[in-house]
Amino acid sequence: MWHFRLVKGESMLPSYRPGQTIIVSHSRCFGIGDVVVVFMQSREALKRITDMKDGKVFVEGDNPDKSTDSRQLGWIVDRHIVGIVTWPKKKLKGRW
């Protein structure tokens, strides 16, 4: 199952811009480098998985100056991942 979402905020610039349409799959098959919708701080946010261990993920925005993420909040339980962005796929150059 998948659904359309609109990107909100600037935390994923330059990969994803505010107002851009994305397709999110409810797949549980995600890994390092994937962009996911994750439930954190009582809301859903778009972030990139940068590390995984013991059922937890470390997520970061591509734009660190505009992102509240695991760098401030710590590891996130992976069951808080709502889905994975399946389109458009954007890799951060030089990292994944």
Task: Map each language-model feature to its residues.
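Extended hydrophobic leader/signal-anchor segments used for secretion and membrane insertion
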Residues: 1-96
